[in-house]
Amino acid sequence: MPKSEIRKLLQEIKKQVDNPGNSSTTEIKKMASEAGIDEQTAEEIYHLLTEFYQAVEEHGGIEKYMHSNISWLKIELELLSACYQIAILEDMKVLDISEMLSLNDLRIFPKTPSQLQNTYYKLKKELIQVEDIPKNKPGRKRKTQKNTKKEKTNIFGKVVPAEFKAPASIKEQISYDKSREKNLVDLLSGVKSNVQLLSENQGEENNVYDLLKSIYSLSSLAVQKEELDKKYQDLQTKCQELEQENSYLKQQNETMTDSFHTLVLQVADFAYASDLDQIQALPLFSQQLVVTLNQLGVFKENYKQM
């Protein structure tokens, strides 16, 4: 089933939840049946979405819920799992599903595509349970810490030492361990320090310029690589489509060749038969000839225009 059909079904479910009526489930089942989806699955999503919106109202409405200390409601996670499953069964990609369900499109969930996608994978890998998840509660359980003293961490989750000795000079500051270069913050800090060091020396403006120019050139190359990768993927997709089309045309050509060969044999058998055999075989020959001509795309309605 095309992606558009899944989208239309979910859009209709949301519409019926927003404006409930006596025939809501009937309309949803009808649309699901026409699209080839299990009616019970569609009805289940309808009830889950209804319960989710009711739970949101109990928390004071969508705005208060989004700014509350609740990251995910249990019913919301159940709905999330059901929506992904129904779309994945119809060969939709997780990325497209996340975009469709998010605030960017159908607005079924008050979440961004990345929030939906990350949570779906956590559910799939059983990193989180189907339960109410507070914002201050991580998906994985933390080990019990004997030391109750709060430790400072950077944005990468690494512990920062409580006591930090300021470097005596800029040269000391940029002499950090190369094994830490994978840390983006350290890299940017090192670049900044190098620029400051070069700027301290008089007459080194060209060195600063060359450094920044090199950084710009490298970043430009990275952007170009992303664009080339995308073009390469597009070309691969196009190549696959052409290969499929070529395979189809090849198969059609083989079929046409076989049909033409059959037609020649039928005409030859009839032409070289005796007069008596021709008279007796004429009705069967005519029927066989029509079948073979149809296989070649020649019909009574179009043969005069060919």
Swiss-Prot record:
The keyword Transcription applies. Keywords: Cytoplasm, DNA-binding, Repressor, Transcription, Transcription regulation, Virulence. It is found in: Cytoplasm. One of its GO terms (cellular component) is cytoplasm. One of its GO terms (biological process) is negative regulation of DNA-templated transcription. GO terms for molecular function: DNA-binding transcription repressor activity; transcription cis-regulatory region binding. This is Motility gene repressor MogR. It comes from Listeria monocytogenes serovar 1/2a (strain ATCC BAA-679 / EGD-e). The gene is mogR.
